[in-house]
Amino acid sequence: MAKKKAFIPFFYFTSIVFLPWLISLCCNKSLKTWITNWWNTRQCETFLNDIQEKSVLEKFIQLEDLFQLDEMIKEYPETDLQQFRLGIHKETIQFIKIHNEYRIHTILHFSTNLISFVILSGYSFWAKEKLFILNSWVQEFLYNLSDTIKAFSILLVTDLCIGFHSPHGWELMIGYIYKDFGFAHYEQILSGLVSTFPVILDTIFKYWIFRYLNRVSPSLVVIYHAIND
């Protein structure tokens, strides 16, 4: 009976780890066709709005030098000019298809992550008793560690999150989240988040040491400062 009670929280922890992956896999397969049909139908009605048209034109300009194209058009005979215009038309259609695929990818990933968040929130609320047992296990495990190991672990985590080399890790993680949600890569937003998050975490961590650790385990704070120095 005791083994069964111990197995249930472990099963709950395992399900929390793998459930987001399963939800993402199922939602991607089930929603992709529906979102594609919805987007293509909507595009037939509106074709390109101003933002989409600007995006397509910017991509086209990146590949072709318009000034050189004008000179080439003047030198081409009529038959070659028609073929050239036909090639430009096909290339523009290809740009539009790529643009639509990108928009579908964005909507699909955002919808999948939103559904995963709702399902996980409901699942956590439904099994909050098992979550409480897991929390007690973690607290008991941390309580049995020595103050030296605790201080070393805190120092390791803080150096990884807010240390000198942490911005590169934050850049990779935030970039992965952006990609997972299907958002475009914006260097200014990414730089702002990378420069802001470590500062916020550092402030929260110092406040936590001041308010919690000093009251619970003063010796741990002393060891931490000794190792940090």
Curated annotation (Swiss-Prot):
Instruction: List, in alphabetical order, the Gene Ontology terms for molecular function in this entry.
Output: antiporter activity; proton transmembrane transporter activity
Tell me a GO cellular component. Answer: chloroplast inner membrane
| Membrane association type | Multi-pass membrane protein
Primary localization: plastid
List UniProt keywords, sorted A-Z: Antiport, Chloroplast, Hydrogen ion transport, Ion transport, Membrane, Plastid, Plastid inner membrane, Potassium, Potassium transport, Transmembrane, Transmembrane helix, Transport
What residue ranges are annotated as transmembrane? 6-26, 107-127, 189-209
- Protein name from the UniProt record: Potassium/proton antiporter CemA
Supply the source organism for this entry: Crucihimalaya wallichii
Q: What is the lineage of its organism?
A: Eukaryota, Viridiplantae, Streptophyta, Embryophyta, Tracheophyta
